[in-house]
């Protein structure tokens, strides 16, 4: 967490110039207070089953927090220093990036007053008409980096369809849509959201009316291009600016690739020589980097490429504490229940990631029976439920969100303090995106990965990828294994799991209501 600052006026009295005042800002660094738990605990350590140990030397000791010394006497701020401070502050503003005043005012109402590093690097270049590849870690403000110059250019020549934003998931598309809608509030700008899970006919009608900016997932937009007729998609031929957000996912080859749908979408747009193309990602993959060396018209300037603390070279935020918890394969759910119920974690908003939709569905139902405030997000839920569940979690109506990797990219939920990997991700890059849901924008966060007998090699691969070792999870006065064995948790969790499985088999929703046409999770 960044040191808090509290402005205090300081009067500079001198013989040469009396009655002159300047304000000085004193940065006071306070060591964060830790919640003190009981000094003694009745928990005892009893291992239910022999567990493997990671084949490496564990790090010893905990990170020490040093409180910086503060001066007893404030030094006065000289006039020349005050002018320099003011000059530096002016340089660290959206105005210095040539952002239009109406956009600055709109950002201010959203409490966005100073640009981040990726915004300072990209906004001027995009306003100058350059194609851009922007790499920056999650939570660094990439959406504003492309939406602000897009809206500013649209305001200079407002027509539809001016801009197209492609993004891999429905939830991320909805988030971008809401953010663009908020930023453009002072203008009569019409954005349109095109995603799967909803009726195509209203979307086709809205698309034919030529909205100013379209935010879409590639699959659904490709469906419109292939089936909705030329009148519907004619406006796409006028697009001036296209954005590929989470470009590494959109351009990734292999099974389940979105690349064919992306190519279909781009084929309906003007040629690259007649439009501006922006790619943003948290991971600059070889597929993304290769675009820099592609042939370009001599009339177009070189592609602007910036890589600022991407998840290639600085994958894990320094404010994120990475831990692992060894669990027996047969009691993974019981360990999760105890972990979420400890004194330190009982009130933390958390996301629990699973590898499969079936696991996520079962976990949500089980945790609900164990009195947790929980909701879920996975690909087989109807879109209306996905939106409603995400809204419940954002509004803190649910403390826990059980999700698959559909929630691992781009979603900005600042309140998340804990990420739990119920299943260890098979791909280390997926781990990076998962834990990136917490410790965003300088906040503190923690990730806990449940490690079974077969997961040790996956954990070691993750550690090699991120360049840091996980610490073994611990909490003062708490033995998770002891609580699982001694407090009857195994029986309680086992019953809840059986009831949840029976509910799924009967075709009931998470509230126990019978559904005749409930889509069975596979």
Swiss-Prot record:
One of its GO terms (molecular function) is ATP hydrolysis activity. Residues 60-75 have a biased composition (Basic and acidic residues). Transmembrane segments: none annotated. Its EC number is 3.6.4.13. It is an enzyme of class 3 (hydrolase). It comes from the Eukaryota. SMART domains: DEXDc (SM00487), HELICc (SM00490). ATP-binding RNA helicase involved in 40S ribosomal subunit biogenesis and is required for the normal formation of 18S rRNAs through pre-rRNA processing at A0, A1 and A2 sites. Required for vegetative growth. This is ATP-dependent RNA helicase dbp8. It comes from Aspergillus niger (strain ATCC MYA-4892 / CBS 513.88 / FGSC A1513).
